[in-house]
């Protein structure tokens, strides 16, 4: 199977292959297959819409990790009119799993920070598979404080399985780095908008995920643990990941129903990877609207609302 297609996308892959075969055959001067191609293209649109109308939580989890899904730098290249990356935590190193810098979106100057995965094996290793170490979170914090100093709104793009769990990260106090970011983000005296663009995994996501607005792309996920990790703990069997995904309620739709996020940003039919330009344009429009709305909120009110939001996390009622 083509690695760019997930298992449940196989009918889509088959139709696209047929369309490509017909187009190749029509290269000859005496062959006209326009009618057949249009019919297959219409069938492809209908089949894609049908498949994506009834996705399970596990299928959405797979989409959130799709190898062609746009990453932070992909969105930056389209959403931002200007971007100047800033590197290093000024203590140890520059963690490539976190990217960030000064940006301009339309007329709006902002600070933008996000997780960054890799497209090929070389880049995945360089980016540590999008799993930051303490120096990554300390770099992020440095940029957050810089944004606060200059009164720039902060935008974060979340896309990680979680913080790096290696011994080297623990030796450099991973938990402290995450905890410090949570504390500092809660008190930042600037508007903060957090957007889950792919995977939102545990504390590794939360460390750049505390803000005044939390947005999620339609086929992104946000959870305390991966479905595989949850299945391994609860059932001692990672093969039960699909069951775990349902129990974790990790989809954007479910989290919106629970009141844990503010907005679900609709993706193109078939997912963000099928039309990154369209997805980025939608994201840009939403971010500009949210920034405009937050401009009207006094700073004291903004902080009070942020604190109230944090205190409601985990609260529930028995009925």
UniProtKB/Swiss-Prot annotation:
GO biological process: fatty acid biosynthetic process; malonyl-CoA biosynthetic process
One Pfam match: ACCA
Enzyme Commission number(s) of this protein: 2.1.3.15
Subcellular localization: Cytoplasm
Keywords: ATP-binding, Cytoplasm, Fatty acid biosynthesis, Fatty acid metabolism, Lipid biosynthesis, Lipid metabolism, Nucleotide-binding, Transferase
Chief location bin: cytoplasm
Catalytic reactions of this protein: N(6)-carboxybiotinyl-L-lysyl-[protein] + acetyl-CoA = N(6)-biotinyl-L-lysyl-[protein] + malonyl-CoA
GO molecular function: acetyl-CoA carboxylase activity; ATP binding; carboxyl- or carbamoyltransferase activity
Pathway assigned to this chain's UniProt record: Lipid metabolism; malonyl-CoA biosynthesis; malonyl-CoA from acetyl-CoA: step 1/1
Superkingdom of this protein's organism: Bacteria
Family per record: Belongs to the AccA family.
Quaternary context: Acetyl-CoA carboxylase is a heterohexamer composed of biotin carboxyl carrier protein (AccB), biotin carboxylase (AccC) and two subunits each of ACCase subunit alpha (AccA) and ACCase subunit beta (AccD).
Family matches, as HAMAP family: AcetylCoA_CT_alpha
Protein name: Acetyl-coenzyme A carboxylase carboxyl transferase subunit alpha
Organism: Xylella fastidiosa (strain Temecula1 / ATCC 700964)
């Amino acid at each position: 199977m083509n690695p760019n297609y997930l298992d449940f996308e196989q009918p889509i892959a088959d139709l696209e292959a047929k369309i490509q075969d017909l187009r190749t055959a029509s290269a000859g001067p005496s062959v006209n297959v326009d009618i057949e191609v249009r019919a297959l293209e219409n069938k492809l649109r209908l089949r894609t819409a049908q498949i994506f109308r009834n996705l399970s939580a596990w299928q959405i989890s797979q989409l959130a990790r799709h190898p062609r899904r746009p990453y932070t730098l992909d969105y930056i290249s389209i959403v931002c009119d200007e971007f100047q990356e800033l590197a290093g935590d000024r203590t140890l190193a520059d963690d490539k799993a976190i990217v960030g810098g000064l940006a301009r979106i339309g007329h709006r100057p902002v600070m933008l920070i996000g997780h960054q995965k890799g497209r090929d094996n070389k880049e995945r290793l360089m980016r540590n598979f999008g799993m930051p170490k303490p120096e990554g979170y300390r770099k992020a914090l440095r940029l957050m404080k810089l944004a606060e100093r200059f009164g720039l709104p902060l935008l974060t793009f979340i896309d990680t399985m979680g913080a790096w769990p290696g011994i080297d990260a623990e030796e450099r106090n991973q938990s402290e780095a995450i905890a410090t970011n949570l504390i500092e983000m809660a008190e930042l005296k600037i508007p903060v908008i957090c957007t889950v663009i792919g995977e939102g995994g545990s504390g590794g996501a939360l460390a750049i995920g505390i803000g005044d607005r939390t947005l999620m792309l339609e086929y992104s996920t946000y959870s305390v643990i991966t479905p595989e990790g949850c299945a391994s703990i609860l059932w001692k069997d990672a093969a039960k990941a699909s069951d775990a995904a349902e129990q974790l309620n990790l989809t954007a739709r479910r989290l919106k129903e629970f009141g844990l996020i503010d907005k679900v940003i609709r993706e193109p039919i078939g997912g963000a990877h099928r039309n990154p330009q369209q997805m980025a344009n939608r994201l840009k429009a939403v971010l500009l609207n949210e920034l405009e709305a937050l401009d009207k909120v006094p700073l004291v009110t903004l902080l009070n609302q942020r604190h109230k939001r944090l205190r409601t996390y985990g609260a529930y009622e028995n009925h």
